Amino acid sequence: MIMKLKKILSALIAGVMMFSLAACVNQHPEETSNPVNTESLRLVATSPAVAQICNRLNLDLVGVCQTSGVLPERYKDLTKVGMAMNPDLEILKSLNPDYVLSPNSLQSDLQPKYASISVNALFLNLKSVEGMYASIEGLGKKFDREKEAAAMLAEFDSFMQEYKDKNVGKESPKVLVLMGLPGSYIVATESSYVGNLVKLAGGTNVYGDGDGEEFLTANTEDMKSKEPDIILRAAHALPDQVKEMFAEEFETNDIWKHFAAVQNGKVYDLDSSLFNMSANFSYSDALEALQPMLYGEE
C-alpha cells in the first residue's frame, strides 16, 4: 500500500516554490496585490532558485542564502542569511527587509518563524516549470519588472511550443520516477519538479499526480504492478552515493530483474545538476536530456 509522506518535503527539499500575485501566500495577504515602490526596496532571497529569478528580473537584494551552489555574481558579496531550510532569524531581522522570498514547500516551517520577527514573507512555488513562470509573472507585477517577466514568459512559450511539436503523435511512455537518498528511495509523482519535467516531456507517470503529494513510498511489488516502460532514477543529495546505492539495489534485489524496463535496458540515472528539487532555468536542458530516454532519439 502506498503511504503519503505529508511531512517529507521539509526533510527533503532545499528550495521549491507557488507564487502568482493573485494567489500569493504571506503574512499580510491584503498587501500582495499592490505594486510596491522599488527604489528603496529591501529584499532577501532564501534559496538559490529564488536568487536566480531575482537576478533575471534585475532585482537588487540585501541578503541571500548560504549555498554550496552557484549564486548570481551580483549577489555573491551580500550578507548570507543561512541555509534555505533554516535561515538565521537574527540576521534576517537585522537586514530590515521589506520582503523575504522563500519556497512555499517550507512555508509551514518558516512562516511562523518570520512572523515571530515581524517580517513580511512571500512564498513562491517552484514545484513545476509552470509554477516558476507564474512566480516570475507575479513578481514582475509586484516589483515593477513586467517587461523582464514578459520576456521570460515569451522565451518559455517559444521553447515549449517547439519542444512539444517534435513529439506530436508519439506514444506516451509509462515512467516510474525514483528519488534517491543515501540508503533509501521513494517515488516521485508528477506533482514534484522531476515528475513535472517528465510530464512536460510527454511521459506518463505511473503514479500520476499522487493526489497532490510530491513523493510517495511504495513497495517494489506495487511498482512492478504499474508495468513502467522506463525507470528514471534521480538523487536528492549526494548523487554519487545515491547512484551507487541504486546500482546495488537493482543488482541485488531480484524483483527488479522482472521489470520490463530493466529487461529492455530502459533504466536511466538523471543528471543531478539538471534534475534537482526545484524548478530553475535549466528546465530546457533537462527536457532535451529526457528526449532520448523517453523516445530513443538523440
Regions found by a protein language model. Give the residues of each.
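Basic- and aromatic-lined ligand-binding clefts that recognize polyanionic substrates
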Residues: 40-57, 148-202
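Bacterial signal peptide processing site
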Residues: 25-28
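Proline-aspartate-enriched helix->loop->beta-strand connector
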Residues: 88-102, 119, 219-233
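Alpha-helical, coiled-coil/dimerization segments enriched in small aliphatic residues
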Residues: 68-74, 186-215
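A short, structured surface patch at a secondary-structure boundary
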Residues: 44-95, 99-105, 206
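Bacterial N-terminal signal peptides that target proteins for export
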Residues: 2-12
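C-terminal motif of bacterial Sec signal peptides marking the signal peptidase cleavage site
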Residues: 20-23
